[in-house]
Amino acid sequence: MTSQEHPILIGDIGGTNARFALTAHGESGYSNGINLKCADYESADDAIANYLAQIGASSPDVICLAVAAPVIEQTADFTNNHWHIVADELANRFEAHQVRLINDFEAIAHSLPLLDDADLMLIGERKFELPNDDFTFGVIGPGTGLGQAGLIRRGDQVFPIPGEASHAGFAPETQQQIEILQSLRTRFERVSEERLVSGAGIENIYWAVHQDDPARHSKKNSAEIFAAAIDGSDEKAVCAVDQFFEILGQIAGDLALSLNATDGIFIAGGIIKRYPELLARSCFRKGFESKGRYKSMMEKIPTQLILHADPGLLGASHYARELALKQN
């Protein structure tokens, strides 16, 4: 990486972690990546100041933050942590010429054309090839919440499509899913897709599948549920994980239909990346392809797991450099 005299600061801020790094004009990629816990800082401003102090960098020229929240008039209020970010306030504090907030999955969408074969794992039998001309992609991924976005290229222009589709209502497709929904409605006024496909979502499913025999329910966190499913020590954990992946597939399939993303759907998120083999042998593709009259179309859409360490930072770095280029 070149001089840090006027660096470009990028960040990928989720409900739990904030990852910061630097990029530079004319460079590719990023450097000086550090992960911070959101709970350790009163605000994003404080976390950024701590990051810059740790690496000994000067105030950034451009700041681009990918945030796990809807961005409205360059302001972000998180649903899964206490931070409130206003772009203008960041610009004033750090004397940055430009600050831009983008949705975290919009940032991941920007990374999709930049990923190498080594960054991807094919899920299903349909081979993926990066189109040479126009394309439409979708990306989805569970973490603290559930993110979704799209990326469209038409000619020499690329358009990201951020959204909050994961807060749409959950639509069960099997009798067992109907029963899970009915159980969860006793806990939540409204059951969104994110209530089932996220870190908390797998715990909700695990609780719901115990409602035929509540006395057997033992509270487990998401990591414990996945571990028990892998070693087969808990049949309810196996059931919960099966449902988790099938429902993820259903929602990913809905995303593909909504965007007409026939060129590919990408799966991101820290949860899934920890269990690639579990995903590969799960009912994900069954849920993805089960679209009635559109089943034959769905069978032709490739699905891939993103293995890159931080596609959010990769996409944010690309976006930030484009932003800096326009500024100059």
Label the predicted regions.
Residues 18, 70-72, 145-149, 204, ...:
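Short, acidic Gly/Pro/Ser/Thr-rich loop/turn segments
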Residues 2-56, 179-328:
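ATP-binding/phosphotransfer module of carbohydrate and carboxylate kinases, centering on a glycine-rich
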Residues 1-4, 48, 101-137:
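Conserved phosphate-binding catalytic cores of ATP/NTP-utilizing and phosphoryl-transfer enzymes
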Residues 37, 80-81, 100-107, 128-130, ...:
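Active-site nucleophile and cofactor-binding loops and adjacent substrate-binding regions
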